[in-house]
Regions:
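Residues that scaffold, gate, or flank divalent-cation-dependent active/transport sites
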Residues: 1-62, 66, 187
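Long, highly charged, low-complexity intrinsically disordered interaction regions
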Residues: 76-140
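Generic non-transmembrane alpha-helical segments
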Residues: 45, 49-53, 83-92, 152, ...
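Short beta-strand-to-loop capping motifs
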Residues: 67-72
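DNA-contacting surface of Y-family translesion DNA polymerases
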Residues: 141, 149-197
Length: 197
């Protein structure tokens, strides 16, 4: 895992130490070894806390989960997100970021933004500025868009999430794959990727 500061220095996820050593030494970067048993224990505590807030939860990875907030009014959903974040911090001591949206892909966009926000919670429910927000999200930061797909999109003048959202279904079907179609639909607020509980 990398801190925001390490990312800003250009240290890539998964880079071996020897590749980043010059940057690490030059900038006084601190490197820590992994403690997977501790991470696993902390992850279980966070996921258990999340289950307190809803019955439908998808544990996506050791440090990510999707929670179904159906039934929470649009007006209260961000406040509910803050309650979840504060409870996790109180019960586990772990600061989190929470992204709330109508689809999994948009919730990942919201979470991407929340990581930089002081409150740590961002809701894209009823956001009128969705195109402005998506325009600021680089195509390689869109959930499900890997390196090969990023190259393909950039070659086809699609460099941000707004452009992918607005691409025609005909173009996607002709030029890409079903995953691209789902991602574009999700960016439009149409849920195509269901919760896996």
């Amino acid at each position: 895992s990398r801190s925001s500061e390490a990312k800003a220095l250009g240290i890539k996820m998964g880079d071996p130490y020897f590749k980043a050593k010059e940057i690490i030494v030059k900038n006084g970067v601190h490197v820590f070894s992994s403690n997977y048993s501790l991470y696993g224990d902390m992850s279980r505590r966070v996921m258990k806390t999340l289950k307190y807030f809803g019955t439908e939860i998808e544990v996506y990875s050791i440090d990510e989960a999707f929670l179904d907030l159906t039934g929470i009014s649009d007006e209260l959903v961000e406040l509910f997100g803050k309650k979840i974040r504060n409870t996790i911090l109180e019960w586990t001591g772990i600061p989190t970021s929470i992204g709330i949206a109508s689809t999994k892909t948009l919730s990942k966009v919201a979470n991407h933004i929340a990581k930089k926000e002081k409150s740590g919670v961002v809701s894209l429910i009823n956001t009128k500025d969705i195109d402005i927000i998506l325009e600021k999200i680089n195509i390689n930061d869109v959930w499900g868009v890997g390196r090969q797909l990023t190259k393909f999109y950039i070659t086809n003048n699609i460099s941000n999430a707004k452009q992918l959202k607005n691409i025609s279904n005909t173009w996607i079907k002709k030029s890409s794959n079903v995953l691209s179609s789902r991602t574009a639909m999700e960016l439009r607020g149409i849920s195509c990727i269901s919760l896996e509980t």
